[in-house]
Amino acid sequence: MTAQTPIHVYSEIGKLKKVLLHRPGKEIENLMPDYLERLLFDDIPFLEDAQKEHDAFAQALRDEGVEVLYLETLAAESLVTPEIREAFIDEYLSEANIRGRATKKAIRELLMSIEDNQELIEKTMAGVQKSELPEIPAAEKGLTDLVESSYPFAIDPMPNLYFTRDPFATIGTGVSLNHMFSETRNRETIYGKYIFTHHPIYGGGKVPMVYDRNETTRIEGGDELVLSKDVLAVGISQRTDAASIEKLLVNIFKQKLGFKKVLAFEFANNRKFMHLDTVFTMVDYDKFTIHPEIEGDLRVYSVTYENEELRIVEETGDLAELLAANLGVEHVELIRCGGDNLVAAGREQWNDGSNTLTIAPGVVVVYNRNTITNAILESKGLKLIKIHGSELVRGRGGPRCMSMPFEREDI
């Protein structure tokens, strides 16, 4: 990394030097059973234990020499002037789907009254309950205030924020600032916008943008994998559509970030397989985890850029051979999540057995609960750093989902 390139990520496996996390906060305590689907959760984590698990995850990374950054801290550091701070508040409010002018005014006054920038950022992440606001006089209530009086939130929380992989993705020296699948998560990208616009280290045009949050088609970081300095992998999934991938790839090639080819993976469109990295991750120079259930239906396209146009070819050969040829290795091994047992594979994929974070070639952070997959990985010579995640996993994401590399050593 140099002063000109604060982002440097040219692989999935190079030694991890710097990573972005988000410690789960009060947004988790604003989950409630009636609105889990709306907020893209299946269960409610216990915040105190989730924070302990997340702190242990961060410490495990530090113990391996990784510098840990926090989203909430970088976002707070990006509010460098009162004018930028006020602009952030107004943009946040404009995207929060607030019902009623009087309600919006009361929330703005609440946020403007918070003096500490990090406290402000954490409050915007947590959401605002109606009970926190002064009672609006009946004469000032609009129709929406009256019709939706039973809904408890004036602004929804952002409980998915601890999955920092998705709102934006680091690619080479650039960043894809994503337009996300759901309204619930699309609001999360405001923090990346302010970091990469105003932060003293990461703002000011130092990081080229290869996708913009104002695009109308969806893409998420769990579908963006950097396999090598030459090759990217992208997923066409529940959360990322093909049109977004085409826009992303044109920008990457035009920005000349060094990549020569992209492998686009098309697979089942459902929550169980919401992102490519929930079913496929790179763990060593020549090894990948894969969920066996996707192998039969998987389609792969090779994409290159020639004469200012994308050239797309559907690949028909063996996946392992295709990966080996593109990575310049003799052989690639696909390690099946859960092994050959369909019950174990289904259970451990649901608990993110395939969602590993590689912090150096052959050194992988995993949830300890996926015992069958972990034993297979160890039998292949991989070093595992096992973390507890009984609460964290309730959000349906693993170590890769919970981390966004900012700097890796080249391989």
UniProtKB/Swiss-Prot annotation:
Location, primary (coarse class): cytoplasm
UniProt entry tagged with the keyword Transport: no
UniProt keyword annotation of Cytoplasm present: yes
Active site residues per record: C401
Domain of life where this protein originates: Bacteria
EC number(s) per entry: 3.5.3.6
GO biological process, one term: arginine catabolic process to ornithine
Pathways per UniProt: Amino-acid degradation; L-arginine degradation via ADI pathway; carbamoyl phosphate from L-arginine: step 1/2
InterPro entries: Arg_deiminase
GO CC annotations, alphabetized: cytoplasm
Localization per record: Cytoplasm
GO MF: arginine deiminase activity
Enzyme class: hydrolase
Catalysed transformations (reactions): L-arginine + H2O = L-citrulline + NH4(+)
Keywords: Arginine metabolism, Cytoplasm, Hydrolase
Family designation: Belongs to the arginine deiminase family.
Name the UniProt record assigns to this protein: Arginine deiminase
Organism: Streptococcus equi subsp. zooepidemicus (strain H70)
